[in-house]
Amino acid sequence: MIIGKVIGSIISTRKQENLVGNKFLIVEPLEAMAGVGRIVAIDNIGAGIGETVLVVQGSAARIGCGMPEAPIDAAIVGIVDD
């Protein structure tokens, strides 16, 4: 699990059918996660720019989104209260 800050969003006019209607955000891992680059993560919980979030990757991301067959590598699964 990665803790990071949402720094932007991705707009995609065309995407795989099972991803239509989903929002993608750019997450910058916090300093404690040194060595991990920016992540594009699917957001099903309504996170916004500037919020600190929890991100999972791999099969945990697909399961966490309820889309086990979707081509998802990272998903936002929580918003951290400051």
Where are these regions (language model features)?
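N-terminal first-folded block
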Residues: 1-32, 36
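C-terminal structural segments of small proteins and small subunits
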Residues: 52-82
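A structural micro-motif recognizing beta-strand termini
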Residues: 29-30, 42-44, 58, 80
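Short alpha-helix capping/helix-loop boundary micro-motifs
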Residues: 37-41
